[in-house]
């Protein structure tokens, strides 16, 4: 799936008529609601419902392959996908290719389990929590 982005906002296509907007701009939700007709659009703030883990480095795709069935050799910058990591439903977004950087979104209630699964997958290559 494709991602559209600029310097402050990323829009991830998440399925038919469904997008995830990721931004540090706190006003974006207000701006979107002003421009969208309430009769034809629903905008929901998911800020507090998701956990985000960002992975960066040369081995990121190899690490993700350990828990996710996606063909990462075809995954490119500004691609996103819905999948699973060790049984946890996730959305993956490739935000940079130099160095390779991915954001993984999961429901907040699965955040700790996802963190442990990802760090276990990183043990061979090492990791640094920030």
At which residue positions do the language-model features occur?
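Basic, glycine/lysine-rich polyanion-binding surfaces/domains
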Residues: 1-130
